[in-house]
Structure formats: structure tokens, C-alpha cells
Amino acid sequence: MAGPTALHLLLVHLRPAVTPGQRDALVEGLTPLRSLKGVLHIGRVEGTESVSTHDLGLFVYLRDAAALERFGTHPLLMKYLQQSFLPVVEDFVSMDVAVERGPAERYGAAFCFCLDFRPDTYDWQVRSALEQLAGNTDKGRLLGVSAGVALNQRQPFRAGGLVFAASPSDLSAVRLPPLNADAASRLVAVAGPASPLS
């Protein structure tokens, strides 16, 4: 997948009474959106690892910002949100980031994250932290990092992305920037088993 690419992230808290069937419909309801122009890949992450702040992560790679704009206003997405998403979701974080790498060719686990930084942090400092994340990953256990800065200033976080692995146990090799006053200030994440939607 040639970049840069737009990556749309959804980190979801489900309502307590959600049934397995409703959860399946939430995930599978995204599948028809794969046919939309500019959609390159759709996947999901289950929040089973202890670092997870949310239950489920959904992610969509799109060709560019124009494809993201079309995706975000498409009637199929509106139907999905009304019928499958909103009835079962308690709250969620949505973010759009610019990435230069797509997903790993094959993966069985992922660490989906959104990071915030102090307001006086420059974009080059955010990019440097993301490059450090990519450089510090244990290449023997992790399959790749697809991360970047927010596409615009309306986003709730400054950076986000995905780290891919073969299995959830390999995600322990992920090394995020420390959460302190000098670096990242807030993190939301979903980590665990992951798969593309076919």
C-alpha cells in the first residue's frame, strides 16, 4: 500500500447488556463499506490485553483525505452508524491520522492507540516520538507500525495508529512514549487479537 494514507480509528466502549449477536453485527456491519471507492483495508482489534482502555477497536485505511471525506459522509456509513453502531456503543473515541504505511500483510494481533501531547508540543516532536516507537519495536516479535499525526486540529488526540503482531503475547514488545509532562500526556488503547474484515 503506497502512502501517505488516511487511517480512521474507532475505539469503542460497549453497553453492558450487549449480546454476542449485537457485537458481531457491530463488527460485520463494516464489511459492506469495503466496496466504497478509496477504502483499502478494514480491520478490528479485541481489547483483551490489560493496557486496553476500550473494548473494541475498528480501523479503516483509506487512499487519501479525499477518500476519507467521501467515506465519512457516505449513506452506507450513516446506515451502519444508526443500525449497528449507536444502539450498542456506550461511548467511543474517533480519530483520523495520516500514515505512510498500511497494515501488515498478515496479522493476528494489534495495538490500536491514540496519544495526546501537551499543547505546546510541536508536530515534529510528535512525529519524533512516533518514529521512536517504530524504531524501538522488537522487530522479531512485531510485524510493523502504522502511525502518524492527526489529519487536522479538530481531532481529539495529536497522534494515533496501530502496531501489528502475529499474536497478542507479542504485543508486550510495544514501547510507547512515556506518559509524563515532557512527552505524551494521555493514552487510549485497544490491544489484543485482531483480524481484517473480509
Where are each of the predicted segments found?
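Acidic, metal/ion-handling microdomains and their immediate structural contexts
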Residues: 80
